[in-house]
Every structure is written in structure tokens, then in C-alpha cells.
Curated annotation (Swiss-Prot):
It is an enzyme of class 5 (isomerase). It holds the Pfam family Tautomerase. It comes from Streptococcus pyogenes serotype M1. This is Probable tautomerase SPy_1139/M5005_Spy0861. SUPFAM superfamilies: Tautomerase/MIF.
Amino acid sequence: MPFVTIDLFEGRSQEQKNQLAREVTEVVSRIAKAPKENIHVFINDMPEGTYYPQGEMKQKS
């Protein structure tokens, strides 16, 4: 049962997230030979100011 977690800065539309989840599900199903109904995609919207690579806050580009 594959679980896929995607962390993105917030700002994508619901349609963009829906399309991303559908396409990721397709790819994982094809490559991992997993039934689509067993694939779970989690999309986490990260507010700006919550990402600190190397201890420095990362701004959206």
C-alpha cells in the first residue's frame, strides 16, 4: 500500500492539487504495480515561514 507525501508551499489551486494527485497515482500504479485504490497521496500546503533549510527561512520564489 504506497503512501506518497508531497510538501508544497501553499498557493496551488484545488484543481492543480487534484491533477497532481491523479498523475502521481497513475505513475506509482504503473511503476510499483500497485492497484490505484491502494495508493494514498497526501499533499501538505506549507505556509510561508515554515521551511528552514540549513537553518535559514526559505521564501517562495
